[in-house]
UniProtKB/Swiss-Prot annotation:
Protein name, per record: tRNA-2-methylthio-N(6)-dimethylallyladenosine synthase
Domain (TRAM) ranges: 378-441
UniProt keywords, alphabetically: 4Fe-4S, Cytoplasm, Iron, Iron-sulfur, Metal-binding, S-adenosyl-L-methionine, Transferase, tRNA processing
Gene: miaB
Gene Ontology terms, MF aspect: 4 iron, 4 sulfur cluster binding; metal ion binding; N6-isopentenyladenosine methylthiotransferase activity
Subcellular location: Cytoplasm
Amino acid sequence: MTKKLHIKTWGCQMNEYDSSKMADLLDATHGYQLTDVAEEADVLLLNTCSIREKAQEKVFHQLGRWRLLKEKNPDLIIGVGGCVASQEGEHIRQRAHYVDIIFGPQTLHRLPEMINSVRGDRSPVVDISFPEIEKFDRLPEPRAEGPTAFVSIMEGCNKYCTYCVVPYTRGEEVSRPSDDILFEIAQLAAQGVREVNLLGQNVNAWRGENYDGTTGTFADLLRLVAAIDGIDRIRFTTSHPIEFTDDIIEVYRDTPELVSFLHLPVQSGSDRVLNLMGRTHTALEYKAIIRKLRAARPDIQISSDFIVGFPGETTDDFEKTMKLIADVNFDMSYSFIFSARPGTPAADMVDDVPEEEKKQRLYILQERINQQAMAWSRRMLGTTQRILVEGTSRKNIMELSGRTENNRVVNFEGTPEMIGKFVDVEITDVYPNSLRGKVVRTEDEMGLRVAETPESVIARTRKENELGVGFYQP
């Protein structure tokens, strides 16, 4: 009888990536098959996020539902991972004694041993340590699930913004070696992946070891990824302005594989608030980066993160944020009301902005961003956009859907063989969250050519050291 695994994931793209790796790992080691139905599962895993308000209570609310399943099936294994697990540790079991496994973002690779331990002597396991980059050495080979893929290039963050829990839950910055990253991407390209999204809490701080022992920069890595045959688009998230250096901007100037879209969090337009947040940059410095980017790539579109109602934020501070939004002309944003995260410096600040005022500021900010986003979309009306076709449309299974370079979802009529390929689409309608168009050119009509297959690149560039260990040498 097939053993089944159910994973519920909350939070960022890093968590989505981690959950996919958990599924691949437990399939390889235990033969667990994913199920969307928790009642069918032999193992339930909750991959948590501590960024949102009341994150801990949300976890225990979900665990309360799963407790009923465990009462019906005592052999059911329940595990809690992610950032809340890293923060709370053994405290989770004090409130939910039926939880069998507690693991952090850096110990998910040990899940097979944890499950074996629980199956063996029924003793609970808690492992929320930070074992450097070990987890990537223990994960199975990547499996493509469509033409796009996430690839983690680093873990953790050293910035210690006063509102953020990431350095405490994921540890400080650790970069994967470049050959590991490039080999994983080449394997994905061999399976039909055309677009990769490089992940990290602060990707532009990547300083990975190269095959010759030197230390690479993020700009170096972007160019190496762009050189992999079969990879036509590169995205990355998330970045910090303080390390968005000129060499990265130069990659936008000379590397067409890097898309004309950037998510660069700023959080506030007030230097006073930025200082309270520990952001180490000013609004003017942020705008200077954007000016350089648009000089290198005039059509680039920018999204950002904003926190409203941070302790001490005045009406004047908020107006400065609104001015920054207008000056930069952001395309979209992830914007939130401040809520204190336990254990962070901001949690000790006086939360002196009334709740109704926070809500009003958030509404004003989001309305302005939505207006700007719609204006950007209207400029695309009547233009021809190159779309990477990802699959069927969520709105209509008889239609296809894909994304433009600037991250717009486009729905259109097409045929199944277009999935995983590029098509040129004329934009005919504009909606708040998507565009609509008609195909004017298929990939076969574009004259695109792959000079060398990903399989041959892997075979040609694979080397072995004196111990017989293979590595990828560009």
